[in-house]
């Protein structure tokens, strides 16, 4: 062989010998890491010396850290263990996302920045100044309502403490009026509410000289030939004369028309006295219906009894009122009721 061929064979043997040694070692003792990138030996040694238990712990830690749980964004779930958290607040000095009151360092830094730059205040700056302005009276509970807290503190100081229990209860009852009844809104309860209010107002208005008076007593009044009806309150009158004058005013137009059509003296010649005569008995008679349903002549009983008995009033023609009860019969009937 020539000298050049011998040199090439030696180089090939030398280059193949370490690979063969590595392969033999790997096959005998298992796969091993080699520092191909030229890193430090300590990293390779540390990584090679890691036990399978540590690798299992790492896997469990990563699974716990990435597990989905319920909670607000930025907050750490209470179910997690603090030892398993990859980013602990103690190590990283974490701060809450929305603090109630800012720290003093942030206040100083923000005020210096605004003074240096000359910009307008932001929301955070206004909140910082509000936190600075709060006094020692305010606490975490009442910082949102400082006025109420201040008034409470003042009232607590002013109220005397040495007051007997009986006196305090009596003063409270005398000073505070009873609670008013809540008004009913809506339909149909409005109807009942109005009835109740009207009843109370009527009771208050009817009470005179400490005596509870009775309510209004409305009675229908009709007239033969009249196309309309009227209602009168009998309790608003005190005698028969007032009632007759009121009925004259109610039915004046109808009686005037009747008299003019019958050929009586004209409207100009008809006076109040003639109209009273018409109502008192010449052409028309005033009658009433009692509780038994009998029609009687008005004026046969005393006024108080008439108010209690009367149910309806009717102005009849004289010819139609001939068979009605006379005064003696009405008096006998009233005595029997008494």
Curated annotation (Swiss-Prot):
Listed name of the protein: Auxin-responsive protein IAA9
Listed Low complexity bias regions: 9-21, 168-180
GO process annotations (BP): auxin-activated signaling pathway; response to auxin
Record has Glycosyltransferase as a keyword: no
Factors inducing expression: By auxin.
Region Disordered: start-end pairs: 1-25, 150-186
Molecular function terms from GO: DNA-binding transcription factor activity; transcription cis-regulatory region binding
Motif (EAR-like (transcriptional repression)): 68-72
Organism, as annotated: Arabidopsis thaliana (Mouse-ear cress)
Keyword Transcription: yes
Disulfide bridge positions per record: none
Pfam family, one: AUX_IAA
Binding partners and assembly: Homodimers and heterodimers. Interacts with TPL.
The record's note on its domains: The N-terminal half of the protein contains two conserved domains I and II. Domain I includes a slightly degenerated ERF-associated amphiphilic repression (EAR) motif which seems to be involved in the activity of transcriptional repression. Domain II is required for the correct degradation of the protein through the SCF-mediated ubiquitin-proteasome pathway. Interactions between Aux/IAA proteins and auxin response factors (ARFs) occur through their C-terminal dimerization domains III and IV.
Entry-linked SUPFAM superfamilies: CAD & PB1 domains (SSF54277)
Domain PB1: 216-318
Task of the protein: Aux/IAA proteins are short-lived transcriptional factors that function as repressors of early auxin response genes at low auxin concentrations. Repression is thought to result from the interaction with auxin response factors (ARFs), proteins that bind to the auxin-responsive promoter element (AuxRE). Formation of heterodimers with ARF proteins may alter their ability to modulate early auxin response genes expression.
Tree of life domain: Eukaryota
Primary localisation category: nucleus
GO annotations of cellular component type: nucleus
Tissues expressing the protein: Highly expressed in the whole plant.
Cellular localisation: Nucleus
Keyword terms, alphabetized: Auxin signaling pathway, Nucleus, Phosphoprotein, Repressor, Transcription, Transcription regulation
Post-translational modification: Phosphorylated by phytochrome A in vitro.
Family per similarity comment: Belongs to the Aux/IAA family.
